[in-house]
C-alpha cells in the first residue's frame, strides 16, 4: 500500500463497518442506536475525506454484527451509508440499506402531548415515502411529521 492510499482508520478483523455516513452524523448514530452499549472496541472516524460526500463519518464495531432491520433503520439518518460485515479483514456481506416500514425505539415523537413521553412505551413510527420527503406517523398519537422534524427533535 502506498503512502497515498494508507487507511486513516485501522482495519478490523471481524465485525461491522458503517461507511459513507454524512459528516456530523456519526455520533448521533452511536447514541440513538445505542452502538456504544458493548464492551467491544469501536473505532470512529469523523470528517474523513470522501469523493462521494466531500466529508464523511465512519464507524467500525468489532465482533458485532447488525441485523438487516438495524441497518435499515440507519437509512433515516444516513440514506447512502453502506453496512459491511467483516470476517478475517475481508468484506463477506454488504447489507442493503432501505427505509423500513416501521422504526421502533429510536426516534422521539415531536408531539409533546403524545403518551410516549409519559408512559413506559417504546417509540414507534410508520414510515411513508412521498414524492417530496419521508413522512413518519407516530403509533400512539397518530400525528404525521416530516422526517426533518423528527430527526431534529432527537
Curated annotation (Swiss-Prot):
Pfam family, one: PyrI
Coiled coil region boundaries: none
Disulfide bonds: none
Essential cofactor(s): Zn(2+)
GO biological process, one term: 'de novo' pyrimidine nucleobase biosynthetic process
Cellular component GO terms, alphabetical: aspartate carbamoyltransferase complex
Molecular functions per Gene Ontology: metal ion binding
Keywords: Metal-binding, Pyrimidine biosynthesis, Zinc
Entry's family note: Belongs to the PyrI family.
Subunit structure: Contains catalytic and regulatory chains.
Protein name as catalogued: Aspartate carbamoyltransferase regulatory chain
Taxonomic source organism: Photorhabdus laumondii subsp. laumondii (strain DSM 15139 / CIP 105565 / TT01) (Photorhabdus luminescens subsp. laumondii)
Gene: pyrI
